[in-house]
Amino acid sequence: MIDWPTCPAVERDPERVSDAWVFRGTRVPVAALFENLEDGALVSQFVEWFPGVTIEQVRAVLDHAARSVLAPA
């Protein structure tokens, strides 16, 4: 399980986007990144398709997810 509260690139607000984790300052769900990557999109395409999301945010989310997955249990 990924510990999203410790990732500075994301936020969650029960009043927005059904309380989903989103990229900070946007309404773009973090899940959209992983869904698009799974479908074969490039990070550069994702950032182009979702102008409010920065490449730095995407990198931070991917780094955070990787660290969470690789962390010892």
Question: What is each residue range found by the language model?
Answer:
Residues 28-73:
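Long, charge-rich, low-complexity alpha-helical segments
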Residues 2-45:
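A short, structured beta-strand/loop element
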